[in-house]
């Protein structure tokens, strides 16, 4: 990539229909884990106007009222009025869960290559990433896109901007100079709103636009980056119909929002609704943990980790480190350090990050990475000093 360029990432609010689905799936996972943390869970959710469908595969000894969990999640998000697209009190909730396939279970429970470990729940490749663009070691565009959505929800829920409704999207286009963030070129923010905020069917009231810029955008974004920044606020001119009424929502459709905003590759596997025996989720968390500790150790300015697995096999097919020329030691030496200091077998990951806990609903909006939440063990940098010493730095 050239040293001077524009790069864009987007986020969506907790009220976006796909994120509603993600949060329901992870709320169900958490409810199960509170009773039986050894459960196997693959909980998928569909949301539409007045309708929620719960399907997937669950093997558990827990007794969970899935319908109530779904309603409680929708209520927490703020869909408490049919005018918003779905109402937690009156929506229909259909439940269609099966048990995990015995063919899959035998490979997960008894790894073919390691009698002391569980096997990977599926084949696949996962990526982790970290860089020094923000204190949280995340790419700046996705980090600030998330913060805009958090701010929108905060002002909606505390009543400071009472005309806001749950569904929203943000997009941040960053200008890079000499490979580093220099300024924000464009901010797009579209938010669902009450009908009285439209001046015409194709134009928002000036007071609405001003409130979004002054109350949501400017308090979040660094002032030094707002140099001739362009603001596009509800550019269609109206966003009254939203949430599951505006679009059908499905679990797992916001995988780039969930990760790094396109700053690194994605293996394709979604996270929400999956217990940590599914390496789509747990190995992606572990790869972030590894990459973040390498950058925190000062061994690279940016670091990408790829891991890959075969179903029923515990040991990864590969663990590859790529620092795009920013490493202070070679990528091969960094890969050797990763093999030495991180156990990336599924059970090793679960133990290393303490993943058999009901911690997942919180991950399902505003990104799984780059957030200072006490439950997010993959965000710790507790191995940075160890890596630095092992590298002789």
Swiss-Prot record:
Domain of life, source organism: Bacteria
SUPFAM superfamilies with a match to the protein in the record: S-adenosylmethionine synthetase
List of residues binding K(+): 44
EC number: 2.5.1.6
Pathway membership, UniProt: Amino-acid biosynthesis; S-adenosyl-L-methionine biosynthesis; S-adenosyl-L-methionine from L-methionine: step 1/1
Subcellular location: Cytoplasm
Catalytically driven reaction(s): L-methionine + ATP + H2O = S-adenosyl-L-methionine + phosphate + diphosphate
Protein residues bound to ATP: 16, 167-169, 238-239, 247, 253-254, 270, 274
Keyword Metal-binding: yes
Recorded GO MF terms: ATP binding; magnesium ion binding; methionine adenosyltransferase activity
One GO cellular component term noted in the UniProt record for this chain: cytoplasm
Assembly notes: Homotetramer; dimer of dimers.
Protein name per its UniProtKB record: S-adenosylmethionine synthase
Organism per entry: Polaromonas sp. (strain JS666 / ATCC BAA-500)
